[in-house]
Amino acid sequence: GHIDHVGGAGAFMADSTGATVVAHENVALRFERYRLTNGYNHVINERQFGQFRRRGYDLAGARHFLPSGTPNPHQTYQSTLDLEIGGTLFQLNHARGETDDHTWTWVPSHKAICAGDFFIWAFPNAGNPQKAQRYPREWAQALRDMAAMRPELFLPAHGLPIAGEKRIHYVLTSVAEALESLVKQTLQMMNEGARLND
């Protein structure tokens, strides 16, 4: 449900006839939150990315943070959903990670995973105090679940694809270990009474 993944959906919908938007059930709730906090989303994204003024966004919220043509999902799912499109099976899997509405997709005929933001070619964006809760423990488990599929092609939403089962396994388990370490260290510091500046 992040803007960088859905913001252009209106253009696809305008060019299609009868397209069906499928998403996790929390996506519509995220879109509603974007609408309710339109101005706030402009402000916090300006702080994080520093690009909204340059690109013509109005920080006062006159323009929509969620582009007005973005469709709500026509079909939703909770945990998993199998879709056959053009004779190809796509197995959608929900897991929490950078968002609570995240989907990763297994395409068995290609031994491929479409990973969305579960992988971004940088340390995972596991927390931002001005934004919605992130889920690093569940995120690590999702990466391990992907590795267990033994994919031969890995397609993240950002950055280059990865080919080769061994390479993909190494990448997925390395990022999972980093997230697990982050959680362990954070909990240890919290339980020891650490302050934000420690």
Question: Which residue ranges define each predicted feature?
Answer:
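Gly/Pro-rich turn-and-neighbor structural signature
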Residues: 59-62, 66, 80-89
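Active-site HxH/HxHxD metal-binding segment of metal-dependent hydrolases
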Residues: 1-73
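Sec-exported extracytoplasmic/periplasmic mature domains
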Residues: 11-17, 144, 148, 191
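Short acidic-hydrophobic, aromatic-tinged amphipathic segments that line or gate anion-handling sites
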Residues: 74-79
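C-terminal regulatory/interaction regions
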Residues: 187-198
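Metallo-beta-lactamase
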Residues: 71, 82, 89-173, 177-182, ...
